[in-house]
Every structure is written in structure tokens, then in C-alpha cells.
UniProtKB/Swiss-Prot annotation:
Keyword set includes Membrane: no
PTM remark: Autoacetylation at Lys-320 is required for proper function.
The protein's role, per its UniProt record: Catalytic component of the NuA4 histone acetyltransferase (HAT) complex which is involved in epigenetic transcriptional activation of selected genes principally by acetylation of nucleosomal histones H4, H3, H2B, H2A and H2A variant H2A.Z. Acetylates histone H4 to form H4K5ac, H4K8ac, H4K12ac and H4K16ac, histone H3 to form H3K14ac, and histone H2A to form H2AK4ac and H2AK7ac. The NuA4 complex is involved in the DNA damage response and is required for chromosome segregation. The NuA4 complex plays a direct role in repair of DNA double-strand breaks (DSBs) through homologous recombination.
A Gene Ontology cellular-component term: piccolo histone acetyltransferase complex
Active site per the UniProt annotation: E396 (proton donor/acceptor)
Residues binding acetyl-CoA, per UniProt: A361, C362, I363, L364, T365, Q370, R371, K372, G373, Y374, G375, R376, S400
Source organism of the structure: Neurospora crassa (strain ATCC 24698 / 74-OR23-1A / CBS 708.71 / DSM 1257 / FGSC 987)
Gene from which the chain derives: esa-1
Stored Pfam families: MOZ_SAS, Tudor-knot, zf-MYST
PROSITE patterns: MYST_HAT (PS51726)
Protein name as annotated: Histone acetyltransferase esa-1
Protein family membership: Belongs to the MYST (SAS/MOZ) family.
């Protein structure tokens, strides 16, 4: 499989055996012709599962983005054509390697005494929640407790993250040791050793190239949910999300658009909707205009709701790998209103106290609202809050591929507007002036200027030049721009937290 955000090329250049197959004999690693968008396309079978509607096959289509992988029924596979079978020699090598890895892991098993200590700590954490047991609790308790307590460090010590995704949110989309699927659910793929980077090199790489997760297991993880019914919309997830394993067998899961509770049975979901009394996110409304509202939710006060929001967003963010510890975060949820209530459009989260100066930890616009200008509103709102705080902010890296594009567009448009204003007044402008005016970090300003090739060195001085082409592009985008955040409507003061409110909830 290709990394997130890239186009997948199915199979390798090696010759494969071809032959007939049936729904019962086809296996993982086979390449077959699968119907997609009315055409037969070459696809690799990465996983197989039995659902209530029958056997389904997880297909990675040739030259298609990873997020377009999907579960398909046997009826969409053309079994009249020969399929390409995986190389048997490689299967033997893989089996031998798997056995070797299993034996190595067994030697490094922690002592029974340590396991008991970890289990008791997890029990105390659940008890301190002060809420009824949740299906997610059982799933978390089955995972290694130590790994989940690590605060956003990769193996090379790098702080990262969505996630959308985007993203991938320390404790919400951070690259800590993630909750993995069983080994037999990981597809047969080459796992190359990832190059090691220093902290500065890694941040620079992620800043300029978008969301490319550095964890090979995360890349090869199979999407487990096929379809989601969310309010009036049917959503098709892009990535794996760690809902309880029992939901893997469902053809569709049902999520309440107000409280975000999830159900596998339609009857249970209908019963819940009749009893659910929530009609807006469980927080304070801090902004309202004719189009949207913003709610501020404290992750410590609304743990279950925020955890459910993280599970929902993980389906559309490739790098969001830690979902349980929401206590140190504030969630800002954007909604649209009608007579039924407030419907979630998207959200961003931020740390209650960020040592790195991040004003966004995770940001996502739900797929049904993308390409409508809502992502820009989320970004603008995050910077308006930074202006009220009197700080310079920056989103936590890495951004998802779509998040990176949205931020670059927002940065470039606002920087051009600032520069044109200085030019009209015939005033000198520096990078620091731009950063303060937009509440951006000087590093983000400088990277944007370099990406747009607006920094030049002339007669011994560094100068900022705005090409005529960019000015015309900005004028066109202004004509299309419909919605903006009105800073006068924001009813918000920077919250003050005690040390207890800022800590993790273990």
C-alpha cells in the first residue's frame, strides 16, 4: 500500500502465477479485476472479512489514493478473468519472519507483577471518570496501558500532530504508540526501515510535505468501518478508526449526530434517538452569526462526548493515533443550525497549555461539508482566538494533506492582503509586522513567502515582492469568498486552568 495521500501502485514488477479463483479460494495478496465507478479496475486484495451481509474484500485500487480503498462484496469482483496469485516463496519467508518476531516478543513479555500494576492503574482511571461504563472502555483496557500514556513522541523522540487527521492533538491525534489491530489483519506488504530524523529535520519534513505518517504499521492498517449513517448523510470512511471490534462485522454503523453515540443495530439506534435530549454540542456557545455557531467543550468535563468525536474524526484523518486522553484539550466545534438543532460541520482542538505555542492540535471538516469554505472558517477562528490571547499561533504538525493545502491557502491570501495594505499606505513591512497582524508565527510567515517565491535578495537587502499573478489570483478568490468570521461576535475570554485541569486523565 502507498502512504497516505499518495496514489497506490498495485503489486510489484515480479511475475505472478495466474489462474481462476472463486469467492472461497481467493486470498489476501491476490490481484483481481474489481468493479469501481462502472469500470473494471485492477486491485489488490488486502484483507477479507465475513459480515452479516456476506464475505467482503478490502481492495486497494491501482493508481488510486489510499483513502479510496474500500470493502467490496464478491459480486463486484470479476471471477471470469484470471487473478494474479501472490508469490508462494514470499509467503513462506513472511511466515518464517512472523514466527521469528513472535518468538522475540514472547521473550520480552513483561512480568506478571508489572501487568497487575498496569491493570490496577487502568481500573482506577476508569473509576475516576465518574460515568457509566462505555463500550470504548472495554476496548481501551485490552490495550497496553503504558504505551497509551506516552505523550506524543515517536520512536525517534519527535513531537508530531492532527488529523483531519485532518488528522492525526497530543492525546487526540499524536504519534504515540498507537492502538493496533491484530497482526493477522495487517496486509502482506514490505515493511522498509524508516530513516531516522532529528527533531528539527522531522518538523521541517512534515511542515513542507504534508501528512506522511512515519509509522509503517499505521500505513498498512486496514479500514474497519465500511459505512456510517450520520444524521441525514451516509459517510464512507477513509481510514481505520478503533471502534470496538464487534463493529467490524457490521455493514453500517449508526452515529447520533448530537451526542455522537454509536450503534451497530438500526433498532437500537432508533430507540436511542427517541430518548436522546441533546440538540447541540455540550459546551458554551462562544460565537454565532447568520451561518454558523461555535461551541467550546472542555475535554475533562465532557470526556465521553470528546472521545466519541475523536473516534469519528479518526475515520477521516490518517495520522490520528491516540484518542482516549482528552482531558488536556479544549474542543471548538463549528455547527450549522436549523429547527432540529445544531449539526456538526467540523472542529479543531487545542491544548489548554501548549509549550510549543500551538493554537491547533487537530482540525477537521467533515466530508459532507468540505469544499464549501468551512475549513477556512475553522482556521480563521483559531487565529482570532490567538489574537484575543495576545499570542502567535501555529497548527501542530504534521497536517493532513488536505489540511496543509487549506492552511497554505489561508496564509498566502492573508499575507498578500497585508502586503497590499502596506503598499497602499507606502509603509515598510517586515516579517514580524505580518506575524503580529495575523497572529502567525514568523516561521509560518517565512515558509509561506518562500513557497510563493516572494522573498528576493536585491542590492544587499532581503525584500518582499508580490507578483502581479498572485494579486490577480487574490482578487478572483475575494469575489468567490462568501463567509468570514466577525471578530466582534466572539464572546470569549482565555480560560484559566489549574494544574489538575491541564494534566492527563490516567
Amino acid at each position: 500500500m502507498s502512504p497516505p495521500g499518495g496514489d497506490a501502485t498495485v503489486g510489484s514488477d515480479e511475475k505472478r502465477q495466474k489462474g481462476k479463483a472463486t469467492p472461497d479460494t481467493i486470498k489476501m495478496g491476490c490481484i483481481a479485476m474489481v468493479m469501481k465507478e462502472g469500470q473494471l479496475r485492477r486491485a489488490e486484495i488486502l484483507s477479507i472479512k465475513d459480515t452479516k451481509s456476506g464475505r467482503q474484500f478490502y481492495c486497494n485500487f491501482d493508481n488510486f489514493n489510499k483513502r479510496l480503498d474500500e470493502w467490496v462484496p464478491a459480486a463486484r469482483i470479476d471471477f471470469e478473468q484470471d487473478v494474479e496469485w501472490p508469490n508462494p516463496d514470499k509467503d513462506k519467508q513472511k511466515d518464517a519472519k512472523t514466527k521469528k518476531n513472535n518468538s522475540t516478543v514472547s521473550k520480552k513479555q513483561p512480568s506478571k507483577k508489572n501487568n497487575q500494576k498496569k491493570a490496577s492503574k487502568r481500573e482506577q482511571s476508569v473509576a475516576s471518570d465518574g460515568q457509566t461504563p462505555h463500550p470504548w472502555t472495554e476496548f481501551v483496557e485490552s490495550q497496553p496501558g503504558k504505551n497509551n500514556r506516552q505523550r506524543g513522541k515517536t520512536e525517534d523522540g519527535t513531537d508530531v500532530n492532527a488529523s483531519l487527521e485532518v488528522g492525526g492533538d497530543k492525546g487526540v491525534k499524536r504519534k504515540a504508540d498507537e492502538i493496533d489491530m491484530d497482526e493477522d489483519e495487517i496486509p502482506a506488504a514490505k515493511k522498509q526501515r524508516q530513516p531516522s530524523f532529528s527533531r528539527e529535520q522531522e518538523i521541517e519534513k512534515l511542515r513542507t510535505s504534508g501528512s506522511m505518517t512515519q509509522n509503517p504499521t499505521e500505513i498498512s492498517r486496514i479500514r474497519n468501518i465500511s459505512k456510517v449513517e450520520f444524521g441525514r448523510y451516509v459517510l464512507f470512511p477513509w481510514y481505520f478508526s478503533p471502534y470496538p471490534q464487534i463493529f467490524d462485522q457490521e455493514d453500517c454503523i449508526y452515529i447520533c449526530e448530537f451526542c455522537l453515540s454509536y450503534y451497530g443495530e438500526l433498532k437500537s439506534f432508533v430507540r436511542h434517538r427517541q430518548k436522546c435530549t441533546l440538540h447541540h454540542p455540550p459546551g458554551n456557545e462562544i460565537y454565532r452569526d447568520d451561518y454558523v455557531s461555535f461551541f467550546e467543550i472542555d475535554g475533562r468535563r465532557q470526556r465521553t462526548w470528546c472521545r466519541n468525536l475523536c473516534l469519528l474524526s479518526k475515520m477521516f484523518l490518517d495520522h490520528k493515533t491516540l484518542y482516549y486522553d482528552v482531558d488536556p484539550f479544549l474542543f471548538y466545534v463549528m455547527t450549522t443550525r436549523d429547527d432540529r438543532g445544531c449539526h456538526i460541520i467540523g472542529y479543531f482542538s487545542k491544548e489548554k497549555e501548549s509549550t510549543d505555542g500551538y493554537n491547533v492540535a487537530c482540525i477537521l471538516t467533515l466530508p459532507q461539508y468540505q469544499r464549501k469554505g468551512y475549513g477556512r472558517l475553522l482556521i480563521q477562528f483559531s487565529y482570532e482566538l490567538s489574537k484575543i490571547e495576545g499570542k502567535l499561533g501555529s497548527p501542530e504538525k504534521p497536517l493532513s494533506d488536505l489540511g496543509l493545502l487549506s492552511y497554505r491557502q489561508y496564509w498566502s491570501e492573508n499575507i498578500i492582503d497585508i502586503l497590499l495594505g502596506y503598499n497602499e499606505r507606502k509603509e515598510a513591512c517586515t516579517i514580524e509586522n505580518i506575524a503580529v497582524a495575523l497572529a502567525m508565527t514568523t516561521q509560518d510567515v517565512e515558509h509561506t513567502l518562500q513557497a510563493l517565491k516572494m522573498q528576493v535578495y536585491h542590492k544587499g537587502e532581503h525584500k518582499i515582492v508580490v507578483p502581479e499573478k498572485l494579486i490577480k489570483q487574490r482578487e478572483k478568490s475575494k469575489a468567490k469568498q462568501k463567509r468570514l468570521i466577525d471578530p466582534e461576535r466572539i464572546q470569549w475570554k482565555p480560560p484559566v486552568f489549574t494544574a489538575l485541569n491541564r494534566t492527563w486523565g490516567w
